Amino acid sequence: MTNERTVKGVLGTKLGMTQLWDEHNRLVPVTVIQAGPCVVTQVRTPETDGYSAVQLGYGAVKAKNVTKPEAGHFEKAGVTPRRHLVELRTADASEYTLGQEIAADVFSESDFVDVTGTSKGKGTAGVMKRHGFGGLRATHGVHRKHRSPGSIGGCSTPGKVIKGLRMAGRMGVERVTVQNLQVHSVDAERGIMLVRGAVPGPKGSLLVVRSAAKKAAKNGDAA
């Protein structure tokens, strides 16, 4: 099975947020991303792997801190060891070459992208913060149960707590993808990409920026 959609992508680091004025004098919140440089460490083809994809490496790491299989993998690609590896499935993988550098200029202004990262950890959270429950009334007979979830199941039918019930627990540190964010501008010289809106994760966290899947499908490009 072949992937018919062409995907561009780059790995980067979240530097923080700021705000800029656009051409219509509107204040726009943007996320600053240090995009790349990435290198191509592997190219997968339908003939050898059964699908078409390209593997990107990002972030420097000392050679002594990688395993022997990883060291052999990087040596085969002819690149220095990288801390992060991400595979992007794309129809044009055969056009990439081992060791090719991918930078912020892979995207241009007004492109739409999907940004994937790891959300901020919030620790143990109740149902109101974690799932948006409304809670109980603040007064009129409610006795110290204002933020409780309420009933979690019947006593005899079904007589158990249903699997997957939303309850209090650890919140955050999950893989999250924000879709259809627009690229505000790209500074190719400094490797900086400004994306409108917020993206997952704290400052300094790893991000994967790729072509927007739903925008491509809407424009007639098969996913």
UniProtKB/Swiss-Prot annotation:
InterPro entries the record matches: Ribosomal_uL3 (IPR000597), Ribosomal_uL3_bac/org-type (IPR019927), Ribosomal_uL3_CS (IPR019926), Transl_B-barrel_sf (IPR009000)
Ribosomal protein recorded as keyword: yes
Pfam (any one): Ribosomal_L3
Keywords on record: Ribonucleoprotein, Ribosomal protein, RNA-binding, rRNA-binding
Keyword Repeat: no
One Gene Ontology term, aspect cellular component: cytosolic large ribosomal subunit
GO molecular-function terms, A-Z: rRNA binding; structural constituent of ribosome
Domain of life: Bacteria
SUPFAM superfamilies with a match to the protein in the record: Translation proteins (SSF50447)
Biological process, per Gene Ontology: translation
Complexes and interactors: Part of the 50S ribosomal subunit. Forms a cluster with proteins L14 and L19.
Function statement: One of the primary rRNA binding proteins, it binds directly near the 3'-end of the 23S rRNA, where it nucleates assembly of the 50S subunit.
Family statement drawn from the similarity comment of this UniProt entry: Belongs to the universal ribosomal protein uL3 family.
NCBIfam families registered for this protein in UniProt: L3_bact
HAMAP family in alphabetical order: Ribosomal_uL3_B (MF_01325_B)
UniProt name for this protein: Large ribosomal subunit protein uL3
